[in-house]
Amino acid sequence: MYAVIVTGGKQYKVTEGEFLKIEKLELATGEAVTFDRVLLIGNGDDVKIGAPVVDGAKVVAEVVSQGRHDKVRIIKFRRRKHHMKRQGHRQWFTEIKITGIQA
């Protein structure tokens, strides 16, 4: 069984037991989180598509860890002007484990 959920402005296809890095949620490690915005649920040939969400469907997950992604380097450069600006960014994430999909 799989589902498509929305969190942090992004869509993720998830299955039970899968580990996933999503945008940061303010939750402690070990806490449970429920995703109610389920766009699609599939089980073999049986597929339920929401309009826009599937009624009564939810995905339950457990917070595994909080962390930061690898650094993304930004360079702004002006040719022939001896000007270069360097910057870096590390985005926070929450790693979750999908524990259940309920339709």
Curated annotation (Swiss-Prot):
Coiled coil: none annotated. Keywords: Ribonucleoprotein, Ribosomal protein, RNA-binding, rRNA-binding. InterPro entries: bL21-like, bL21-like_sf, Ribosomal_bL21, Ribosomal_bL21_CS. The keyword Hydrolase does not apply. GO terms for cellular component: cytoplasm; ribonucleoprotein complex; ribosome. GO terms for biological process: translation. One of its GO terms (molecular function) is rRNA binding. Disulfide bonds: none annotated. It comes from the Bacteria. NCBIfam families: L21. Belongs to the bacterial ribosomal protein bL21 family. This protein binds to 23S rRNA in the presence of protein L20. Part of the 50S ribosomal subunit. Contacts protein L20. This is Large ribosomal subunit protein bL21.
